[in-house]
Regions:
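Glycine-rich portal/gate segments that line the openings of hydrophobic small-molecule binding cavities
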Residues: 38-80, 133, 137
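A short, structured loop/turn motif at beta-sheet edges
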Residues: 14, 41-45, 68-71, 91-101
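Hydrophobic ligand-binding cavity/cleft-lining segments
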Residues: 1-44, 144
Length: 146
C-alpha cells in the first residue's frame, strides 16, 4: 500500500482552503492531469465525486464518496476505480482568521500489479504534488482579487 502525507502552512483562511478542495468541478482548471471532474451532492451530506485522469497518455478515472465537516475536513473513500483501496483525508486547521495549516493524507493500492506498473507512477506523481497544486490555485485566486 502506498501512503502520502503532506502538510503546509498557508496565508488563507481554513474555510477558503476547504472550499477550494471541495469544488471538485473546478479541478480541470488548475490540475494539468485532470481530464474532467464531476460531483453530486449526497442527501446525507458530502459529495460523490468522479475525477478523470488524462496524463502523459494514461487515462483512468475513479469515484469517491466525500464526507465533509464544513470548513474543517473532507474524508475521501473509494467508490469505484482502479484501486483495491483508496482512503484520504484533508484537514484544515485554523491558525488565525487569515491563515491555516492544510494536512493531506492518502493511502491507496491498485487492484492489479499491471495497473500498479501502468498507472502507479502517474498516480504517485499526482498524489505527491496535489497539495502544492491547491496552494498555487489559492495564490492565483487571491492575487486576482483587488
Amino acid at each position: 500500500m502506498q501512503r502520502v502525507k503532506k502538510s503546509v502552512l498557508v496565508p488563507y483562511a481554513a474555510a477558503a482552503m476547504f472550499e477550494l478542495v471541495d469544488r471538485v468541478e473546478d479541478y480541470p482548471q488548475f490540475l494539468p492531469w485532470c481530464g474532467g471532474a464531476h460531483a453530486t451532492e449526497r442527501p446525507e451530506g458530502g459529495k460523490t465525486a468522479r475525477v478523470d485522469i488524462n496524463y502523459h497518455g494514461v487515462r483512468a478515472h475513479f469515484t469517491t464518496d466525500n464526507v465533509n465537516h464544513a470548513g474543517e475536513s473532507i474524508v475521501v473513500t473509494l467508490r469505484d476505480g482502479p484501486f483495491r483501496h483508496l482512503h484520504g483525508e484533508w484537514r484544515f486547521i485554523a491558525l488565525s482568521p487569515d491563515a491555516c495549516k492544510v494536512e493531506f493524507e492518502l493511502a491507496y493500492e491498485f487492484t492489479t500489479h499491471i495497473l500498479e506498473k501502468v498507472v502507479g507512477p502517474v498516480f504517485s506523481h499526482i498524489a505527491n504534488t496535489f497539495v502544492d497544486a491547491f496552494v498555487r490555485r489559492a495564490e492565483a485566486i487571491h492575487a486576482a482579487r483587488p
